[in-house]
């Protein structure tokens, strides 16, 4: 294991997560090997940036919302600037976490070891079934998930269990290989395809993580529509056969 690989920097894209970001940052800072947490506040209208900074994260801010992929790239670019200023901060491993994990982010340690030891190039968390705030099951996620999973399978031959999971650990080399990232919510799907096409190793790991699950209200439906748009674009840019979504909707 190289010294650089053993140094882990946690990257957290965040928008309007003031209620959870401090707990997420605090839990991430205590993970083994994590030396730094960088949060990109992606145009929040609340106190996300202030709460993240108070919890010990380095904060990069977008004046307007630019999407998840752009937020991750800005945070990694900020890491590069820090490394130029102080070579002791050089990190060979990145841990990508969603901002709404809260204290459950403390369970992400199993993602790290396979990457820093060289057993895997990219690890992905498989989350348990999620519930909304009122205790009901999360709803309406099937079409996006199925589109992502079938698209990845058609392009690579591998069928993922968690194609949309944002909880990922990877080497800097793998991140650079997958860059520029697919835009917005297509980031994870694009990354998975690019890594597999490069002949690298992906390991999915079951981890007990909890995030703010979406329901079936209008806001949730609009969110999933944006996800489907970005996932479809990421797949199309990588050669997915046109009409995939129509075939899934028709049950083919």
Segments predicted by a language model, with ranges:
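Hydrophobic helical membrane-anchoring modules
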Residues: 1-4, 180-252
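Short beta-strand/loop segment that forms part of the nucleotide-sugar
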Residues: 12, 25, 34-43, 60
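Short, well-formed alpha-helical segments that are part of the catalytic scaffolds
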Residues: 16-30
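Donor nucleotide-sugar binding loop of glycosyltransferases
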Residues: 17-20, 44, 104
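Conserved donor nucleotide-binding strand/loop of the catalytic core
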Residues: 38, 49-88
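A conserved acidic beta->alpha catalytic loop
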Residues: 41-49, 101
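Acceptor/aglycone-binding surface of glycosyltransferases and processive sugar-polymer synthases
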Residues: 63-66, 70-76, 91, 104-181, ...
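Short beta-strand-to-loop acidic/aromatic patch adjacent to the donor-nucleotide binding site
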Residues: 85-102
């Amino acid at each position: 294991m190289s010294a650089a690989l053993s140094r882990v920097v946690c990257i957290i894209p965040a928008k309007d997560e003031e209620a959870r970001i401090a707990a997420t940052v605090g839990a991430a800072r205590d993970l083994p090997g994590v030396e730094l947490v960088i949060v990109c506040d992606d145009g929040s209208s609340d106190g996300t940036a202030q709460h993240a900074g108070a919890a010990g994260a380095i904060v990069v801010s977008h004046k307007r919302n630019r999407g998840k992929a752009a937020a991750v790239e800005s945070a990694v670019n900020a890491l590069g600037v820090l490394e130029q200023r102080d070579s002791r901060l050089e990190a060979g491993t990145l841990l990508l976490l969603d901002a709404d994990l809260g204290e459950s982010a403390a369970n992400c340690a199993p993602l790290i070891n396979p990457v820093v030891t060289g057993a895997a190039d990219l690890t992905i968390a498989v989350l348990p079934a999620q519930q909304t705030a009122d205790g009901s099951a999360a709803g309406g996620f099937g079409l996006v998930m199925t589109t992502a999973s079938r698209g990845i399978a058609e392009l690579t031959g591998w069928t993922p269990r968690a194609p949309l999971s944002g909880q990922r650990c990877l080497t800097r080399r793998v991140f650079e290989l997958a860059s520029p990232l697919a835009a917005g919510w297509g980031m994870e799907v694009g990354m998975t395809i690019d890594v597999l096409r490069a002949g690298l190793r992906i390991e999915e790991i079951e981890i007990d993580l909890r995030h703010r699950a979406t329901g079936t209200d209008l806001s949730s439906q609009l969110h999933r529509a944006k996800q489907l748009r970005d996932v479809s674009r990421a797949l199309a840019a990588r050669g997915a056969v046109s009409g995939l979504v129509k075939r899934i909707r028709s049950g083919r």
